[in-house]
């Protein structure tokens, strides 16, 4: 169904609700597969929601084989971004991948040997570094062990280290330098494949009539298609409820307010040409990565000692960074990098995670015919956006052709790695994965 059915109704083969980096990737892959795609987003453009607040880290250490394989396959897409999109960088400004490497510091809640085994099974290059090796190669990094996490207002936070840490070093990790632009690149690539994007288009109603979904918009228009993909980010749970979808889900989602802060790297940590590594530090409750021109991006790994800011709705979230979050996260970063300076004036961005119960995404069909979800991304799926689009395209194609994805989950074979990824790992009906860190690190 490609025709417009009336001046107030927009028809298509598939509607993607949400134009963040995930929704834009889904739209691109559906359009690339030959579908007439309509993208609806309540914002002013692609990536204007929580995507714009992403740290845009590209890393590979997760708690299951399939999630590691997913991130490793996606890495090649980011590295070959222009080719992946079919866009000419001389014609269209493109986000860029920066290879920095990453240190994943030891912590008791992430058993070391299974992590090493999973990385090896996938084929991710890595080295395990002991404390002395870290100190020799990355002298700015303190190797003290401080677990468990403590609030910075507790004197125990400043106590001497109880031991020393090693780390898994993955040299191919890095970051994308502009997450909003990356989403816009995907949206542009989708449009060049025939997709239409409609912004400032808030969905306020959703009903299935016969074999077609009809979505009502706040401005009085409507959109119709046999297929709908919910990629609404922190609004995804609400959109499911609006559509009467989700009763069968064993995995719930909730919006969580988060802050990411920016300071300046310690002198000598790295340069744009030879950047120092990102540091993932559950031991202290933080993650950090370099940025262009000496920037240092600092986020949190959800320490249990800090309050979680769960939201009833992402609408109206306070978009200003707070002194409390800034002090907590940047002080933890400075404990790990003793030469890091902590400016008095907070600087950073606010975003909202769409948190799944086990911090693992849901890429799946639903019990409602024609309704699919790319949700529960939990603040850790920017890195997987290009392949998430391919996952949804594969699931939609299989299910619309009559395949029972619940009984026989689709297997995705990586174009770049040849890895087989069981998409049942991202099922809405999966058991809660008790082995995840229950943090943004997955």
Give the ranges of each region predicted by the language model.
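Glycine-rich FAD pyrophosphate-binding loop
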Residues: 32-51
